[in-house]
Design a protein with these regions (language model features):
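N-terminal active-site segment of His-dependent metallophosphoesterases
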Residues: 1-49, 57-75, 80, 139-142
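Short, conserved loop/helix-junction motifs that constitute active-site signature segments
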Residues: 43-46, 98-101, 121
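Short Pro/Gly-enriched beta-strand edge/turn motifs at strand-loop
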Residues: 49-57, 98-100, 125-131
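Acidic/histidine-enriched, beta-strand-rich ligand/metal-binding domains
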Residues: 52, 82, 105-106, 112, ...
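Internal catalytic-core helix/loop-beta-alpha segment
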Residues: 77-111
Length: 157
């Protein structure tokens, strides 16, 4: 069993509220639009970090992270990208990527809208944590914590 802190779209902003929100998780995943490496350094100071770069990320961030991250967490196959869409309206190439990968969990960001939904057609859980940063059209900063237990996902606040 592993607890995960998930955020996206920090756009160079990280603060004590976010760091405190993640203090009890095992790993932090960042779904892109990090902004700068200072965000990553602050997250890594408290927990191990997995991340992908997003469309606003420059050369420095892109030199440390990939566009697509595929990995296994507690027997769950995970695919993480920044621009991914959502079930029924995936970004170009994403549905094919998910089908080929055998993913059980798809994580993305970009929309600045927190959304957790199950894709009944592909049999994949989709999680977008919304935006944890200050830049954008969102009114509320969001992030999410969940537990991966074998092939189960338990979301908690």
């Amino acid at each position: 069993m592993k607890s995960i802190g998930l955020l996206s779209d920090t756009h160079s902003h990280i603060d004590g509220d976010i760091l405190n929100f993640f203090k009890d998780v095992d790993e932090i995943w960042h779904a892109g639009d990090i902004g700068n490496m200072n965000v990553v350094h602050q997250l890594k100071a408290i927990k191990p970090v997995r991340a992908v770069f997003g469309n606003i990320d420059g050369t420095e961030v892109r030199s440390h992270f990939k566009e697509v991250e595929s990995f296994t967490c507690e027997n769950m196959n995970v695919v993480m990208v920044h621009i991914g869409g959502y079930p029924g309206k995936y970004a170009p190439g994403i549905k094919s990527l998910l089908q080929k990968s055998g993913a059980n969990l798809f994580v993305c960001g970009h929309s600045h809208i927190l959304k957790v939904m199950y894709d009944k057609i592909l049999g994949i859980m989709h999680i977008n944590p919304g935006a944890a940063g200050m830049s954008g059209f969102h009114y509320k900063r969001t992030a999410i914590r969940f537990v991966v237990d074998n092939q189960d996902i338990i979301i908690y606040s």
